A protein has these predicted regions:
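Short, surface-exposed amphipathic charged segments that create phosphate/polyanion-binding patches used
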Residues: 90-99, 206-209, 256
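Conformational coupling and interaction surfaces
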Residues: 11-18, 31-43, 213, 219-361
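Short, active-site-adjacent cap segments at secondary-structure transitions
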Residues: 83-85, 174-175, 248-249
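Ligand-binding beta-strand-loop-alpha-helix segment within the catalytic cores
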Residues: 73-75, 102
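A short, structured active-site edge motif that brings together acidic residues
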Residues: 77-83
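Fungal secretory targeting signals
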Residues: 1-10
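A charged helix-plus-loop insertion that forms the helical arch/lid used to bind
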Residues: 92-116
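Active-site histidine-anchored catalytic micro-motif
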Residues: 11-72, 87-89, 108-109, 121-241
Length: 361
């Protein structure tokens, strides 16, 4: 009997789906990890990166939002503060030649007025913390200081080979560092799922309004183009790209009210602070990680990232068929459309009935 039980537990662990979720966390940024937990994915840790704001601020947002819902049993690991090469000055010099991006993320000019009003920090000192931005409450805890996000990723794929999804909905800096640190890292992961990687949207950027142009800009890849190329050409068993599809489904006021009808700390924060101007970007990628079958239209293509600083497409992706692909790139799964109803229902259930640390005891 003991042998049977032990064997059953070992089999259960071998079938377990783990994830490390890397993002530029913010007040309402908790939905992706709630979606993952609701889908029985065990989150080994959250990682912070520099994309919409500096990673130090994002890491504390991760800690704070976990505390809000009794999820502090999930550790947070600080990622790289700086992209591999890019800096605010270098970014703005590129813009002088190729045009201004509608959303500049952490590289937007420093604005003390906006910070005083609750905006997350941009440019300036990357390690400064703007407490006014923590509408979810300033955290009591802090990120883990035992190791870095990239080191943690490497350690976990060795501990659970073939079982750990690397989810990235911000810059790919930490993933690229892990790829370069350990030649086995990517191949030992289960897969890589990212939010970002838009294709064929230049005309919409040019003819739409500024908000529509914002929806089509690719700051997650463009803030660290070199890291994006390293990560998206690495030998992960599978890479799923939630690019254009992430713009498919938008929240509505009615949906926020429906979520709030089941009161808990997360449904309340979602109701108060989720911006209706933006689609379910990160949530779409998280749902695809949990249940790839929500994709109803996808294709396999070879993908590269433009790392030429002199190019107007610096940081954007380019896709190829196999016969025309250059050497050194790989095939990815590019999702065009998801089942919107299933996505909405998954988000709603995760918010209305969120998991907590008590569920893992």
């Amino acid at each position: 009997m003991l042998t049977f039980v032990t064997g059953s537990l070992a089999l259960e662990r071998a079938d377990k789906h783990y994830a490390i979720m890397d993002n530029d966390w913010y007040t309402a940024g908790f939905v992706p990890y709630l979606v993952a937990l609701d889908g029985d994915v065990e989150i080994l840790g959250l990682a912070s990166d520099t994309a919409n704001t500096w990673q130090a601020q994002g890491a504390l947002h991760a800690v704070a939002t976990l505390e809000a819902g009794n999820l502090s049993c999930i550790p947070v690991y600080s990622g790289a503060t700086w992209p591999l090469i890019n800096t605010p000055n270098r970014f703005h010099a590129w813009e002088m030649i190729h045009g201004v991006l509608p959303w500049q993320g952490a590289f937007a000019p420093e604005n003390k007025t906006l910070e005083a009003e609750g905006g997350d920090p941009k440019s300036g000192d990357p390690n400064r913390i703007v407490k006014e931005a923590f509408k979810e409450g300033f955290p009591k805890g802090r990120p883990e200081n035992s190791t870095s996000a990239a080191n943690f990723m490497v350690e976990m794929v060795h501990k659970y080979p073939g079982q750990v999804t690397i989810y990235s909905a911000g810059a790919l800096t930490n993933v690229a560092l892990a790829v370069r640190m350990d030649p086995q890292f990517a191949s030992l992961a289960k897969d890589l799922v990212i939010m970002g990687g838009y294709v064929d949207l230049n005309m919409l950027q040019a003819t739409g309004n500024i908000m529509q142009a914002d929806h089509q800009s690719d700051i997650n890849l463009m803030i660290d183009p070199e890291a994006s190329k390293i990560a998206l050409t690495a030998d992960f068993p599978n890479i799923t790209i939630a690019g254009n599809v992430a713009n498919q489904v938008f929240p509505t006021k009615e949906f926020l009210e429906e979520v709030r009808s089941v009161p808990n700390p997360y449904s309340e924060l979602f109701y108060k602070y989720y911006d209706l101007s933006f689609p379910f970007w990160d949530e779409t990628a998280a749902a695809l990680m949990v249940d790839p079958s929500i994709s109803v239209n996808q294709t396999s293509v070879y993908l590269d990232v433009d790392t030429s600083y002199g190019s107007p497409n610096y940081g954007n992706i380019h896709v190829y068929q196999k016969a025309l692909a250059p050497p050194g790139i790989r095939e990815v799964n590019y999702v065009f459309e998801v089942d919107a109803e299933r996505l909405i229902n998954r988000i709603k259930h995760a918010l209305q009935y969120p998991k907590s640390c008590a569920d893992f005891e």
